[in-house]
Regions:
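Beta-propeller folds
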Residues: 1-161
């Protein structure tokens, strides 16, 4: 079994029946799974991790998560959602081993929504900041090095496109 939500330490037993599994991501070496759950069906997503080599769910949790993807090794990148509007507005790099996190991108404009993805060759993480009328694209290398994860702008925002 990939995940038994009864084993997730941060889900209260009384909310198990109302908890939705939102999705999974698997690390390149298949040793770690990142999963997202909506605890109590509140439309607020929490991410957790399972070590597939030991079969144990880690106690680590990330709150107000939008997208989550693996970098290299045990590093993940995720979008964090605003507590009031649930709008994904920043990208955080998180090291599952150490618990260290760093915000690498933030868009404070309340009309912009941020999402992330990986290029097909798995070399870069793509950061999109979108509205219904415009967008801009940033990229960062998919690496464990903290210095190399600062994004650079690939496509500048153009209004009314």
């Amino acid at each position: 079994m990939i995940l038994d939500i009864c084993e997730v330490p941060f889900i209260p037993a009384k909310l198990l029946r109302q908890t939705l599994i939102e999705g999974f991501k698997i690390s390149d070496d298949h040793s770690l799974i990142a999963f997202k759950v909506d605890i109590g069906n509140m439309e607020r997503v929490t991410a957790g991790f399972k070590d597939m080599t030991t079969g144990k769910v880690l106690k680590t949790k990330l709150t107000n998560v939008g997208d989550i993807i693996f970098g290299c090794g045990r590093t993940v990148f995720y979008t964090e959602c605003d507590a009031d509007s649930n709008r994904p507005y920043k990208v955080v790099r998180y090291d599952v081993r150490t618990g260290d996190s760093q915000t690498i991108f933030m868009d404070d404009n309340p009309t912009h929504y941020v999402d992330i993805g990986i290029t097909k060759d798995k070399k870069y993480i793509v950061i999109n900041s979108n509205t219904k009328e415009d967008s801009e694209v940033w990229v960062t290398e998919r690496t464990e090095s903290l210095q190399e994860t600062l994004p650079r702008k690939l496509i500048t925002r153009v209004k009314d496109v």
